[in-house]
Amino acid sequence: MTQIKICGLMRPADVVMVNQALPDAIGMVFAPGRRRRITMATARQLSQQLDPRIRRVGVFTTNQLSEILALVQQHIIQVVQLHATVDDPRIASLMAAHVPVIQAMTPANATQCQADYLLLDNARPGSGQVLDWNQLQSQRPVRPFILAGGLTPTNIVTAINKVYPAMVDVASGVETAGNKDREKINLMVQRAHQTGVSTPLLTEIRRN
């Protein structure tokens, strides 16, 4: 089994789909300028409708630390995913506040990850661009990691069998015409859960 996160939920209809498929986590995007960005009010609505077995991750870039902490303190999100510089001071601040942090990195700088969890992605997150899995095989991190970058129902099994991630993270790969697709979500969750033998991540995060 490989865990899976469905990223970029925007609508109540998206929550209905993931509640049926039961991925291990979902992502809500708060990063400025991103197509899938949602407001705190929308995120609160979605989180209240979400099955409590699914972990809630907030995705950030240049957001202020105060905004991130507010989302955690109001129980809208449980985990913070940061796309920022390697030495971003917010990582230490969040960890000091006992907030679980996922740090998004390219494979080239993965060894510099300072956060609780490592996510490997390409330089343009959410673009659907596929990572070079053959290259990643020779650069595979020692620690468990999350794999993102161009994953689809068609290539997910190959990706898992090549690089053995603990979790996969998908956004555009479960969309049709820019919206979440029920059939693709179901396929992705089913295939991820049926493939791989990895150490699960995020299991110790308290549900609230």
UniProtKB/Swiss-Prot annotation:
It holds the Pfam family PRAI. Its EC number is 5.3.1.24. Pathway: Amino-acid biosynthesis; L-tryptophan biosynthesis; L-tryptophan from chorismate: step 3/5. One of its GO terms (biological process) is L-tryptophan biosynthetic process. It catalyses: N-(5-phospho-beta-D-ribosyl)anthranilate = 1-(2-carboxyphenylamino)-1-deoxy-D-ribulose 5-phosphate. Keywords: Amino-acid biosynthesis, Aromatic amino acid biosynthesis, Isomerase, Tryptophan biosynthesis. Transmembrane segments: none annotated. GO terms for molecular function: phosphoribosylanthranilate isomerase activity. The keyword Amino-acid biosynthesis applies. Belongs to the TrpF family. This is N-(5'-phosphoribosyl)anthranilate isomerase. The lineage of its organism: Bacteria, Bacillati, Bacillota, Bacilli, Lactobacillales.
